[in-house]
């Protein structure tokens, strides 16, 4: 390690555990009010902003106590974003930590072993809703910017932190990072790596999946189950129709060679997750049912192409429904005497594309080196979970890399927690990223 890099790391030091836990306790204490599930639960992210500002204002240009430049930007009342900048000396040389969102998913206290809306400590475990996703990261990056404001290291790079509103639910548009990008408030971040801090397990996450939510309605003919030859069984139509659609999907979108390069845990998948049918007696063959599910698509396939293909499958099945496999000697999907044919109807909700991070980016190599130095090993991974906001950033020209220091096992889960030692390592990774980019 170069002496200047080592000196920078030593000047900033490690995470102040007491300060971190104190701040996180305040944030988790607000988590009940930043649950994001409209229309019932609309988060008030400014409750989180207040605590972050209380930590950083003493080291800001606003108070004259330090170099931090703070910009609180709100597009909806009570739902602010926060941009915090530590200025460097070289124009255009910049790195950023983005994605630390100030809303959380819902939690039912009756289902938890401890109060989700107050921080509790069990050894190394810091427990509560948002500790892993993502208030733990809000507190961590706040402590990073606070340390920079206190130590005032002479950096060539400008370091920017962007705390965002409205990540967990997009049903209310125009609140968070999408608006910051639209208003060009983040444009200068395109000059350097943008680290999206909202994943888990201390390793670079280099790929995420796209998502295509779909719904298939199956229409047959309801009839008495003792006269099965007079019915078109919508459930059987659903089972066989969906089986055929899945077979065609996996034929046309097989595992992609790049998935191994990126370490994806799974290839693209198309599967049902919900089944709905009208209530009726057990002696009634149903005339309709609905199956819903999703496609999880690795970023090496095009979302629009998949949507087109799925519709083609359905159109072909409808046009040749006599060829679809049946179940038993009287099972059928056509009643010629009644001029009735079974029918599939496909619809989609809003789709999003996946992300493949740039593995040739200096920002990626710096993240890997810092992770190896601190954690002891580096193993980038990819999942077909979705982070649509970072795909939008990538499409806008940002060099997005992702990492996080919570636990994947507790992400969106009951009894959520993170580990203080993991967050300490995350802080050390951040400092090494900054120090290494000083040498680039």
UniProtKB/Swiss-Prot annotation:
Zn(2+) 1 binds at residues 101, 133. It holds the Pfam family M20_dimer. Zn(2+) 2 binds at residues 133, 168, 412. The active site is at 103, 167 (proton acceptor). Binds 2 Zn(2+) or Co(2+) ions per subunit. It is an enzyme of class 3 (hydrolase). Coiled coil: none annotated. Its EC number is 3.5.1.16. Its cofactor is Zn(2+); Co(2+). GO terms for biological process: L-arginine biosynthetic process. It comes from the Eukaryota. InterPro entries: Bact_exopeptidase_dim_dom (IPR036264), Peptidase_M20 (IPR002933), Peptidase_M20_dimer (IPR011650), Peptidase_M20A (IPR050072). Keywords: Amino-acid biosynthesis, Arginine biosynthesis, Cobalt, Hydrolase, Metal-binding, Zinc. Homodimer. PANTHER family: ACETYLORNITHINE DEACETYLASE. Belongs to the peptidase M20A family. ArgE subfamily. This is Acetylornithine deacetylase.
